[in-house]
Amino acid sequence: MAETALHTPGKNYTFGTVLTAMVTPFKENGEVDYESAAKLATKLVDDGCDGLVVTGTTGETSTLTDEENLGMFKAVKDAVGDRCKVIAGTGTNDTAHSIQLSKRAAEIGVDGLLIVTPYYNKPSQAGIQAHFEAIASATELPVMLYDIPGRAGIAIAPETIIALSKHPKIVALKDAKADYQSTTTVLANTDLDVYSGDDGLTLPLMAAGAVGVVSVTAHVAAAKYRILVDAMLAGDLATARAAHFELDPIQRAVMSHVQGAVAAKHILNWQGVLPNTVVRLPLVAPSETELETIRTDLREGGWEI
C-alpha cells in the first residue's frame, strides 16, 4: 500500500486543483473561435482555476481536426501563459494518432496531456495499458489518465491503473467512473493525483484523498469550486459541505438535462461570456423545455436568468 501524505493547500500539484474542462467556442459559420477561447480561458483563471483541460470531451474534440485541436492548445496557452496549467486532450482510440498529436502538442508548449481510454475498439486491459504506456513514453510531458467508461465503453480496471502509475510520466487520473470502491483502491495503492471527473462527486472523492476536480460546471462556478476544494484540502468539512450544497442546482443545470458542452455554452452566452451557443453535430441545441429546466435549476441556485 502506498504511503500517501495528507493533501494540503499550497502544494504544487502537477496540474493544479480546480480545472475546467473547457468548451471549444465556434463562430456562427462553424469555424473555431480562437479569440473567444482565449477570452474564456483568461476569465476562468481570473475566477479561480489553476488548470484548464483543452479539447477534452467537453471541448468536442471528436469533431475537431488535428489543426483545430492544436490551434486551441496554442490559443489557450498564449492567453494564460504560466498563470495556470494547460492540459491538452490528445487521446483518441488510435494509439499512433494519439502519439503524433501528443508530440505536436508538446512542441506548442502545453503543460501536460489528458489521455482518454481508447473508445469503440474495446481493447483488453493489457491493450489499454499498452496504449497509455506508448503515448506516455512518446513525450516528456506529464500525463493524466481519463477513465470514463460511460463514454469509452470500457473502464480502466483499478489493477491496470495501479500498474500504469509506475510509469514515470503518468502522474494523475481524471476519475469519471462513479465507482467509489475502484477509486478507493487506486488511492490506497498509488501516489497518483486523482481528480473528480464527476462534478457532483468532488466532495466525497476528496474525502478519500483526491486532490481536486476537472469540472464542466466550473465554467460558470469556478469561484465556488475553489472554495470547496481549498476547504477540503484544509480539512474544513463544514465549509466544503456548504459549497457542495450551493453548487448542487448549478451542477444539475449544467450536467443533468443536455450534454455538458451544450448547457455550458448556453449559460456562458446568457452571461455574455460567449457570443453564441454553436455546437457541432452530432450535438444539437436544447429544446425550449430543456432550456427552461436549466433556467429553473439556475434560479434555485440564486441566479437571475
Where do the language-model regions lie?
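Gly/Ser/Thr-rich helix-start
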Residues: 31, 57-60, 90-92, 198, ...
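Solvent-exposed, flexible loop/coil residues
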Residues: 27-30, 36, 68, 123-124, ...
